[in-house]
């Protein structure tokens, strides 16, 4: 489970409507993914990634619920670019919540448990320092 999936779990009872959690990644980008719920379980439609808001909105083809701290930053731009396809979660559902992480964990299959040692961090893009070092070093 990742933070984006946990954010999608803020809205678990909406089935068959895509949920797009977005987190501000700075530099006019958002970390995002797209999930759909079926039978109370989140299914990944688009894997987590980092994109510009313009690139993300160009891929939105149906009504989609946006949730996450990126909504506060990019709401107007998303509304303009996605038009009627943009649906925004209520403010109290846009932040990460421990209860949503617990809900996401409860959806795991019975044999899908991980030990703490098996957990790993997933970085969707290199840090600014890494990118600048690569630019300097070719």
Question: What role is predicted for each listed range?
Answer:
Residues 1-95, 123, 128:
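Surface "functional belts" at beta-alpha junctions
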